[in-house]
UniProtKB/Swiss-Prot annotation:
Residues 1716-1793 form the Carrier domain. One of its GO terms (molecular function) is phosphopantetheine binding. SMART domains: PKS_AT, PKS_KS, PKS_PP. This is Non-reducing polyketide synthase adaA. Binds 1 phosphopantetheine covalently. Residues 1642-1659, 1683-1706 have a biased composition (Low complexity). Non-reducing polyketide synthase (NRPKS); part of the gene cluster that mediates the biosynthesis of the linear tetracyclic TAN-1612 neuropeptide Y receptor antagonist. The decaketide backbone of TAN-1612 is synthesized by the non-reducing polyketide synthase adaA via condensation of one acetyl-CoA starter unit with 9 malonyl-CoA units. The FAD-dependent monooxygenase adaC then performs hydroxylation at C2 while the polaketide chain is still attached to the NRPKS adaA. Residues 388-821 form the Ketosynthase family 3 (KS3) domain. GO terms for biological process: fatty acid biosynthetic process; secondary metabolite biosynthetic process. Residues 1482-1629 are annotated as: C-terminal hotdog fold.
Length: 1793
């Protein structure tokens, strides 16, 4: 049969369909990967138009709305403007080509247009669309070529309008006039004669003439400027009385040869801007509308030029087109069919079709409309990218006002039409003192109303691993975010890592929060350790990510009132961008701060009369509300693949801003409408298809009016009325629960999601009086309703409900979501019905476990028809599992109810214990041949594809080795007892290997911790352990079986299992010559022995033993394995096994042959296999050996791998308390066995991979909405006390200021920038003593300290103490030796014990003392620096820094110069070597900015300290060039910034060199052994220094080096043994932070700083904490003391804590020592830990981990400080990591303290 001819006809008019609907359809299908070519074409066309618009003049550009897709262009009527021709031409081209491409993809049609059979034709602009096809050889080329067609059509349209408007200006009123009329009943020649006459008589210029633009036999189209056409029809009698009709041509003249020329056309086309190669060849015939013949163009450039020339200058002759088509059709004489494709129909097309039918009556002529496919539904969208996905909301949770603490209560509240507003409760603030309706009280609220969550402080701290102290300080918003996040995830069935979309690295959180009441008010009353992580907004999300271990983005957003919905929109954007696969989003608001009430009231936001009255005449502002809500969102395709319950689908979401509003807080209807239009375009949804809008609806006059305007104009426009069956319902949840501010949007979203579930719209209760007169009065006519009663919202069959959710921010933001119904679930997978199902329940506390059991029981009592399989699937595969567990395997719901009732009534929960923190090890034990039976593992084979595939793959290998298939055995097709030894043994080993791999899958582990195989089972064990390949194991099993069958007689020998030791058997059977003979075959336990021998001998033995009361059982095997009967195969087996490779086991092998544990790769070899066949199985000895080595113990889990658990009893006998599970059991359904085994493993702490267990039939199961987790809640609440938010309004400047102790007169003339007051100075003939007081807060001293900052704190450098030492040293020396010119000094043995950190309160003195004693005969002066108590003026007993000054005997310094000159060349040599290394790029050269940028890793120097101009550094060696500042900046001996500049190179070497581990550590100097300067440093002086640091061999983590200072290549100073100690970076805060207590300020530090050395306390049984002495300075940098000591014991009952927070009821929930029984140091430590964390001592059980107790790194530092300061114990904070449990810590304390 010959191929048909094809005609594709492209018209020049839009179809009569709704243009927006057509483009919406294209846009919607373009998001589906089944329409990839269509999507690409739409994207390319959009890009082309964007580029063309961008090149337009500015006035024209402004006429085009911003567009990211084509939808906004369809919303604008361009015809009245200058872009009418351009846009209509481009959109028609896009529409026709888009429909063509989409039709091909929808029909999955292959390209079937050939050059000899296909013809293309078109009219006017339709020719350009046709050109896109004419240039193509396949569909993808149509996409590329089509974009160029769009470009050309747009440019031609712009040009036509530009020229035409120069011929005649548009109408002033904007009305449209036609540029073409069609005249019927006239011939072209007659009409041309009449037009020529008219044009001549009227003197019409050629340019403006009326002319013929198209013609056929019966009609003629007349074109020209509109006024000229009207004049012609009035003036010409022939025209006036002709039959004519104005055509819808409003944009200018085409087909006008007198108007356009080819040169202009070429310039307009601008071929250099083509988006395709202009040389692309023409592939298909495209007929000219003038000649009816194919265009003669051969390339794309020629074709577009020809078409454009014809469009602008050529006359259309419809008759020629028809003739050309008939001619092309006639050429295919052999064709019997003619297929025509077009876009709807037209008069022209009807005429063409009639002509074809008349000319070819024998041909079958069929027509295809290319439009209808766009309205078809092709099933669930298959998005081509994340950006095209619909999104699925799969989980939600909330805490809302009015007691709506869960979704059911929230819906109940809405359904009942309740109003939840009340007066402010007492737990927020005292309304009596903070409410003043008159407004006269500053900072008071003018309204007493709000909507509040009941007890928002309730929280299960233990569940979230938080201590009570941390929970108390954590914002309740953050806590409830955690709680609702968990509940939403639980509802969604999210289990981390279960599916690709639940990969924790790809889960993100987005929450909206707009206030910080708790941090600013409640927690700030007593700022504690957790003030920052507990109150800063970022931690709301961060805590969720951290707790659940989510690695995706974490964003906390503030967009004022729209924060919650904006967070949802941001979350959706992350999904569309592919940044995450699952998101948690929500909004948070808990009101406690009256300041915000005052601010909002004064800003006229709040209603003074009560609730939000949305759209009511009396609306007077909003009523504030609490609210916390969370939703879980995924891409729709992921949710469907994951078998999730889909609550609703998000089609689009967007946020914009009301930039044009009259004020920043005033809403703007225009911006709101723009946002609606944007989301509707994104979703490709008709606004009339929206059936519900959840209003933002604050109940303000301005807000209600603006939102009413925007909603009604877009969703119920007057110019496009809704039908009666298209009602639009409106509502606002704020009428019920008030305005939740940051949580308002999420509350609205939750309401709509519940409406989808309940198929009902709650009553709108926001109009207590009459509707606001600002609202349009024609709502009913526009089919818009505010339901005053509950209204049904059913989902009609095959229909989809769509809704809008609005949320607007007071700052001007507008957020809108478009929702639709979830797709109807189609269950296409048949479920394998399992006889028994596991059901598991878990919790994180005993109390919650009991409550969870009770709620599940209540659920089943209310829903007795619950499907057990669905329940099992939900509790096992779709729940997060916790440490307290119950599990059972049941066959029906009544059995489960019985189990749960027993658990409740028998208090089974109290007898449970939490699973261990580490999963117990698993050992696989493989049974031997005695476990065989027909149909082994049949149920698993039939139901589990993974197991079935493994068996079939192993069976395939076995068959390729030449052995028979064992599948018939599994399927029970082989009768019991008829299988050969070969089939029997292969069946067992194949099933065991497959079972092992199934268990590895179900347990989620790569390998067992050890394996042991019994007899035949050892082959499977060796294969699993990697000793043998699977193929080699099967080969050996099969070959050995063949040898046994060939060389051993079945039935001649047997095996007997005896319940006795081998010694008992020997004693009872005897050993004489007449005694029956036997051999030991297996020693299974110490009391279970298997012997083998001939049938006769074993029968005799059995008779004897049973006579003695010994139990005996015949082993059901045809041969006596492990006896002399096997000798017949040994030699042959040895030959077979010789070529088999053996490898080192990947896991320990418990060898029953060797009676030991095998780790090496040599013990198991070919000889081993032969011996194992002949020699006895020492199963008991192997287990004993494993126990002795600690490979197995009572905690080990044993999995019996085999058809029947024969080895289970052996293991139980050998390992007391052993827990062993079975794979299969004879005469028991496989899934009954498997379910029970999985439950056992689950309860033991080895959680199975439940997802894999249910994966085969997962789509056939349903996720049930079970009761939510029952929390063990305690009300953690810090009550706002007093009236300080009011009082602060009345504070005035002023107040007393303490007088600094340094302000009293000094008894000496000595006073410098660092020495402020000399309190004692005594001088005699040979000695002098000086005592001085200095204040760090003195401006000069403080400026010097702040020149050296660490951890953002000013820290005193060594140079400060050096200047003080030199100042006092020179002063006292001159007192004893008057007239001395220059005093040389050597600062020796200088050591700083503690850092001195400047307090932040500069108004409070921070004194220190310096004491010096000079002894002239010894030329020695001692120095000591002390802390001073600013309150008592008492100095500390011990100094924080010490040193001495030595005065050289030679006051000229000549001896120093001689000494240094001897080594100068060495120093210069090292400097030159460093320069050489730098030239070779082996050493680093650092500029000043780079050097001090590196220094910032530890210390930040002020500009005056930055003397180093250049540094060359290599490892721990360096030199630098230095220029000192010219200004001394104070009164000094030597300015500290000069001293530091010439010496801090050593600090840079240690803290900036790549040879140091600066990521984990920083390095600080405790001092030096000597510091000498032979000459004074000079202002602006240039110096060079050199240093090399070495590790000190006698002191760990300590470095030292000599630093040399040179001027003009001469050494002028040396710092000897300059030391640096390595300190963990995490202690930076601990050592370098200002003390909170100004009276107990921090101690000084050298540059960069000194840290206290670790001091070891001698072990002692009891160390009593000592109360600090008021007259002494306590150890530096300790935490502030508590007001009172902790009680000696903690109460276990619920009682208020020191902050008014109830302590949770404690339970003895785990085995271990009772903390209250721990005494001595350990007991006191536990009391301190309990006090600091807020826990009860009874909760510190031995197996409780510090992670579970909420002891994080921050708390660890606090505890270590407390233990040191209060008990004198030097304990590092990392001890809580090294001792992870309370028991570990108490053991360490008892041993070392």
């Amino acid at each position: 049969m010959s191929a048909p001819t094809k005609l594709v006809f492209f018209g020049n008019e839009f179809p009569n369909d709704d243009l927006k609907a057509l483009f919406r359809g294209l846009h919607r299908h373009g998001k589906d990967r089944r329409f990839r070519q269509l999507a690409t074409f739409l994207e390319e066309s959009t890009r082309v138009l964007q580029n063309e618009v961008a090149q337009l003049p500015e006035p024209l550009k402004k006429l085009v709305p911003h567009f990211e897709n084509l939808m906004p262009l369809t919303e604008v009527d361009f015809r009245q403007g200058p872009l009418g021709a351009a846009m209509e031409s481009a959109l028609l081209t896009i529409l026709e080509l888009g429909m063509f491409i989409g039709h091909y993809e929808a029909e999955e049609r292959v390209w079937d247009l050939s050059a000899d059979r296909a013809t293309l034709a078109g009219l006017s602009i339709g020719l350009l669309a046709a050109a896109g096809v004419a240039l193509s050889t396949h569909l993808a080329e149509v996409v590329q070529n089509g974009a160029e067609c769009v470009r050309v059509s747009f440019r031609l349209g712009v040009y036509v309008h530009d020229i035409s408007r120069k011929l005649e200006a548009p109408q002033a009123d904007g009305s449209l006039l036609s540029w073409a009329h069609v005249v019927t009943g006239e011939t072209a020649s007659d009409l041309q004669e009449e037009l020529s006459r008219y044009n001549t008589e009227t003197g019409t210029p050629e340019l403006l003439k009326v002319f013929i633009s198209a013609a056929d036999k019966t009609s003629v189209s007349v074109s020209g400027p509109p006024s000229r056409i009207r004049a012609a029809f009035r003036a010409s009698q022939r025209l006036r009385y002709s039959k004519s009709l104005a055509l819808p041509v409003y944009d200018g003249l085409c087909h006008a040869a007198h108007l356009y020329d080819e040169e202009t056309i070429h310039r307009v086309l601008h071929p250099d801007g083509s988006v395709i190669p202009t040389s692309r060849p023409v592939q298909l015939a495209l007929l000219s509308s003038r000649s009816g013949q194919p265009f003669e163009a051969t390339t794309a450039a020629e074709l577009f030029r020809a078409i454009s020339t014809e469009l602008l200058t050529g006359t259309i002759f419809l008759d020629n087109i028809t003739a050309g088509i008939l001619d092309r059709t006639e050429r295919c004489a052999d064709a019997t069919q003619c297929q025509i494709e077009t876009y709807r129909t037209s008069l022209v097309f009807k005429g063409l079709l009639k002509a074809l039918e008349a000319c070819f009556p024998d041909r079958t002529i069929s027509t295809t409309d290319l439009i209808p496919w766009v309205f078809q539904d092709y099933g669930a969208r298959q998005p081509k990218s994340c950006a095209d996905s619909k999104l699925a909301i799969v989980g939600m949770a909330c805490r809302m006002p009015g007691g709506a603490n869960d979704l059911d209560l929230f819906w109940e509240l809405l359904a009942q039409g309740r109003d939840t507003h009340t007066t402010v409760p007492a737990d927020r603030f005292d309304l009596e003192t903070h409410y003043d309706p008159t407004g006269e009280t500053e900072n008071a609220t003018r309204t007493p109303f709000g909507n509040f969550i009941d007890q928002p402080g309730l929280f299960d701290a233990g569940f979230f691993n938080m201590s009570p102290r941390e929970a108390e300080q954590t914002d309740p918003m953050h806590r409830l975010a955690l709680v609702t996040a968990y509940e939403a995830l639980e509802m969604a069935g999210i289990v981390s890592g279960r599916t690709p979309s639940s990969n924790p690295k790809r889960i993100a959180t987005f929450y909206g929060q707009a206030s910080d009441d708790w941090r600013e008010l409640n927690a700030s009353q007593n700022i504690g350790t957790y003030a920052v992580p507990g109150g800063e907004r970022a931690f709301a999300n961060g805590r969720i990510n951290y707790f659940f271990k989510f690695g995706g983005p974490s964003f906390n957003l503030d967009t004022a009132c729209s924060s919650g919905l904006a967070a949802v929109q941001a979350a959706c954007s992350a999904l569309w961008a592919g940044e995450a696969d699952t998101v948690l989003a929500g909004g948070l608001n808990i009101i406690t701060d009256p300041d915000n009430y005052a601010g909002l009231g004064n800003g006229h936001f709040l209603s003074r009369t009560g609730q939000c009255k949305v759209w009511d005449q009396s609306a007077d502002g909003y009523c504030r509300a609490d609210g916390v809500g969370s939703v879980v969102i995924k891409r729709l395709e992921d949710a469907e693949a994951d078998n999730d319950n889909i609550l609703a689908v998000v089609l689009s979401a967007a946020t914009n801003h009301s930039a044009e509003a009259i004020s920043i807080t005033h809403p703007h209807a225009g911006a709101q409408k723009e946002n609606y239009t944007q989301v509707l375009h994104q979703a490709a949804v008709n606004p009339l298809d929206i059936s519900y809008v959840e209003l933002h609806g604050t109940g303000t006059q301005a807000g209600d009016a603006q939102e009413a305007e925007s909603v009604l104009d877009i969703f119920a426009p007057r110019n496009h009325r809704r039908r009666a069956d298209q009602p639009l319902h409106l509502g606002a949840v704020k009428s019920n629960i008030g305005h939740g501010e940051a949580a308002a949007g999420i509350a609205s979203l939750l309401k709509v999601l519940l409406m989808y579930q309940k198929n009902e719209i709650p009553a709108h209760i926001g109009i207590p009086t009459v509707i606001n007169p600002a609202i349009p009065t024609d709502l009913e006519q526009r089919k818009v309703y505010l339901p005053r009663t509950k209204t049904a919202w059913p989902r009609a069959a095959g229909q989809i409900r769509r809704a809008i959710v609005n949320s607007f921010g007071a700052h001007g933001g507008n957020t809108t979501l478009v929702l639709e119904d979830a797709p109807e679930k189609q269950v296409t997978v048949a479920r394998e019905e399992r006889s028994t199902h596991p059901v598991v329940i878990s919790a994180k506390s005993k109390k919650s476990l009991a409550a969870n059991v009770e709620t599940l029981l209540a659920y089943l009592d209310e829903n007795p028809e619950t499907d057990l399989g669905d329940l099992s699937y939900t509790t096992c595969a779709r729940r997060m599992h916790h440490s307290w567990r119950l599990a059972t395997a049941v066959s029906d719901i009544p059995a489960l109810q019985k189990f749960l009732r027993n658990a409740v009534s028998n208090d089974a929960v109290s007898q449970t214990r939490p699973i261990p923190t580490e999963a117990p090890p698993v050992v696989f034990t493989f049974t031997g041949q005695g476990a065989y039976y027909a149909g082994l593992a049949q149920g698993l084979f039939q139901a589990l594809p993974f197991f079935r595939a493994e068996v079939r793959q192993l069976d395939h290998l076995s068959q390729r080795l030449g052995f028979p298939s064992i599948v018939p055995v599994i399927l029970g097709e082989v009768e019991e007892g008829t299988a050969t030894a070969l089939v029997t043994q292969l069946s067992i080993v194949i099933v065991e290997i497959a079972l092992a791999r199934l268990w590895l899958l179900l347990l989620g582990i790569p390998a067992p911790h050890a394996v042991i195989g019994h007899s035949l089972g050892e082959y499977a064990a060796l294969a699993v352990a990697g000793v043998l390949s699977t193929a080699d194991a099967l080969y050996l099993v099969g070959h050995r079986a063949q040898l046994i069958e060939e060389h051993c007689t079945p039935g001649s020998h047997a095996m007997l299992s005896v319940r006795a030791t081998i010694a008992d058997i020997e004693r009872l059977v005897g050993t004489g010559s007449d005694a029956p003979t036997y051999e030991l075959s297996c020693q299974n336990t110490h009391q279970d022995t298997v012997i083998g021998g001939s049938i006769q001998d074993l029968n005799a033995i059995r008779e004897k033993l049973e006579h003695e009361g010994i139990k005996c059982v015949n082993v059901d095997v045809p041969f006596a394995f492990h006896t002399a009967q096997m000798d017949a195969v040994r030699e042959r087996l040895a030959k077979a096994v010789a070529a088999v490779p053996f490898k080192t086991p990947s896991v320990p092998v418990l060898s029953p042959l060797l009676g030991s544990v095998v780790f090496d790769g040599k013990s198991i070899n070919p000889e081993y296999i032969v011996r194992a066949t002949r020699e006895p199985v020492q199963f008991a000895t192997a287990i004993d050996a494993a126990q002795e080595l600690g490979i197995v113990n009572s905690q080990t889990l044993w999995v019996d791998i085999g058809p029947h658990p024969i080895c289970a009893s052996f293991v139980r006998s050998l390992v007391p308390g052993a827990r062993i599970v079975s794979s299969c059991r004879r005469n028991e359904d496989n899934f009954a066995t498997m379910a029970k085994s999985l439950c056992t493993l689950h309860l033991a702490g080895r959680t199975p991979s439940w997802a894999e267990y249910f994966r085969p039939d997962e789509q056939a199961y349903s996720l049930l909405r079970l009761p939510k987790y029952r929390w063990n809640e305690v009300n953690y609440w810090i009550q706002y006390l007093g009236t300080w938010t009011l009082d602060k309004a009345h504070l005035k400047n002023g107040g007393s200021q303490k007088r600094a102790i340094t302000d009293v007169p000094s008894i000496s003339s000595l006073r410098t920038s660092l020495i402020h007051q000399v309190t004692e100075e005594t001088v005699d003939k040979t000695t002098a003593t000086l005592k001085a007081i200095s204040d760090i807060q003195h401006p000069d001293f403080l400026e010097a300290v702040h020149g050296h900052t660490m951890n953002n704190c000013g820290v005193a450098t060594s140079s400060i103490w050096t200047d003080m030492a030199m100042t006092v040293g020179e002063h006292l020396y001159r007192r004893l030796v008057p007239g001395t010119d220059h005093v040389l000094m050597d600062l020796c043995d200088f050591e700083v014990q503690h850092a001195q950190v400047a307090n932040t309160n500069s108004n409070t003195p921070q004194p220190l003392a310096l004491e010096a004693h000079l002894d002239l005969p010894t030329r020695h002066m001692s120095l000591a620096w002390y802390d001073v108590n600013a309150t008592t003026n008492q100095r500390a007993d011990a100094p924080f820094a010490t040193g001495s000054i030595k005065y050289p005997a030679d006051p000229t310094g000549a001896a120093w110069s001689i000494e240094w000159s001897r080594i100068t060349h060495l120093i210069q040599g090292r400097i030159e070597a460093l320069q050489h290394l730098a030239a070779e790029n082996k050493a680093s050269t650092l500029s000043k900015p780079l050097a001090y940028a590196l220094f910032k890793n530890v210390v930040d120097y002020a500009p005056r300290y930055r003397g180093m101009d250049r540094v060359v550094i290599h490892d721990h060696e360096a030199f630098s060039d230095i220029t000192l500042t010219t200004d001394r900046h104070g009164t000094w001996h030597t300015p500290p910034h000069w001293i530091d500049s010439v010496s801090h190179l050593a600090g840079l070497v240690m803290n900036g060199s790549d040879a140091s581990n600066t990521r984990d550590f920083f390095y600080v100097t405790p001092g030096c052994s000597s510091c000498r300067m032979a000459e004074p440093l000079i202002a602006g002086g240039k110096y060079r220094n050199y240093v090399r640091m070495f590790p000190m061999p006698d002191e760990a983590h300590m470095y030292a080096g000599d630093l040399y200072i040179l001027r003009e290549d001469k050494i002028i100073g040396v710092v000897e043994q300059l030391k640096f100690r390595r300190v963990p970076r995490l202690l930076m805060d601990r050592f370098f932070s200002p003390n909170k207590n100004a009276a107990a300020h921090a101690a000084p530090a050298p540059a960069p700083a000194a840290v206290p050395a670790v001091k070891k306390q001698p072990p002692t049984e009891t160390i009593q904490p000592q109360a600090p002495k008021t007259e002494q300075k306590q150890d530096q940098l300790q935490l502030p003391n508590l007001a009172s000591a902790a009680p000696s014991t903690a109460s276990s009952s619920s009682s208020p804590s020191s902050s008014g927070v109830a302590t949770p009821t404690t339970e003895q929930e785990a085995p271990g020592a009772d903390a209250s029984a721990v005494t001595g140091v350990a007991g006191k430590c536990l009391e301190l830990i309990a006090n600091e964390t807020g826990l009860g001592v009874a909760e510190l059980t031995a197996d409780a981990t510090f992670v579970q107790l909420g002891v994080d790194s921050l708390m660890s530092l606090v505890l270590s400080e407390k233990l040191r300061s209060e008990m004198g114990l030097e304990i590092k904070s990392s001890l809580f990591l090294e001792c992870p449990t309370v028991g570990d810590l108490t053991g360490w304390l008892e041993q070392y303290c």
